[in-house]
Amino acid sequence: MTKRLGYIITEENVTEELCKAAIKCAAKKKTKRYSVRRVLNNLDSYAKKLRRLILDGTYEPSLYKECHIVDRGSNKHRVLHKPKFFPDQCVHHVAIKLIEPRLKARLDTYAIASIKGKGITYGYKAIRRWLDTDARHTKYCLKCDIRHCYDNIKPDVVGRAFEKFIKDKKYIDLIKKIAYSHTSLPLGNYTSSWFENLVLLEFDKLCHENSAHYLRYVDDFILLGSNKRKLRNLLLKISLCLAEQGLWLKKNYQIFPVDKRGIDILGYRFYHTHTLLRKRNALHFMRTARKWRKHKTPFRARSLLSRIGNTKWYASKNFKEKYLKGINRKELIRYANRRY
């Protein structure tokens, strides 16, 4: 059994410098807000307050502010729960900073997203490497999705996951306060993605040990292998493991030959011989190019430049010839550099 971590919340670990760093991290891309500027303008004072809240165990979570959005990528309705900047968001960052290096070391290598250095590009390179170097064990793919992953991870499950990893009672109490501040993992909390990854640690281990290659991006995951029957038999183990955490798979899981259908994940479709852009993303690209031709703005120039830069990751020669003909990159850069 892996040794549990202790002595996390101590005078030596929770320093004013750590609290200042946490406040600055929490303030990124929010510096125009009055509530954030007020804290940054009195950084020393607020860092001392934050330190005492954590060391004394007097932190109490505030109510969340609910916000409704439509996710442009998937066109799904999302409900965000925004915590107050101080003390809540700052406490969340301190809580993760205290254990981040040791937590990262325990997470699965290919459990990606919301971890610095492990984004879409990291996942893309991993899948491409497997397909290019191991054709035998990438013949079939099992593609699944965990149903309402964040909504179904409950506070008691988060608490149990941390108790297996950490024995410091003060730190466990802090984590439980954050976890029990909502009925599930709220979209909008910095801690939510870390909590999810820790809860799914045993699940990741099971998948990794029973398949040739495994990758999980938030709640979507793929398992690759040479035998279709083995992948199908693995479904029962996966379902039982998830059930222990109060989770279950969507019914639209798929087992298919990679060469015939391609692996649709991370915004691409992967084949052994090439990679294509996902159809939905290609449509967004075409619309962006069409809007640019109709009316040129700095925002549209930046959006189009970003998508053009992304073409190096997939087979895009025919796409560029058909939909980007006549678009001048120098003109795009000139518009993108404008402030308004």
Where are these regions (language model features)?
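Non-catalytic, polymerase-adjacent accessory regions of viral genome-replication enzymes
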Residues: 1-48, 52
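Short, conserved non-catalytic motifs in the polymerase core
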Residues: 29-37, 65-90, 106-118, 177-197
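A conserved non-catalytic segment of reverse transcriptases
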Residues: 245-309
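Short Gly/Ser/Thr- and Asp/Glu-enriched loop/turn motifs at secondary-structure junctions
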Residues: 62-64, 215-219, 252
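Active-site-flanking structural segment that lines cofactor/substrate pockets
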Residues: 43-77
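Conserved polymerase palm-domain catalytic core
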Residues: 125-218, 222-239, 256-262, 298-332
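Active-site-proximal segment of RNA-dependent polymerases
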Residues: 1-9, 96-154
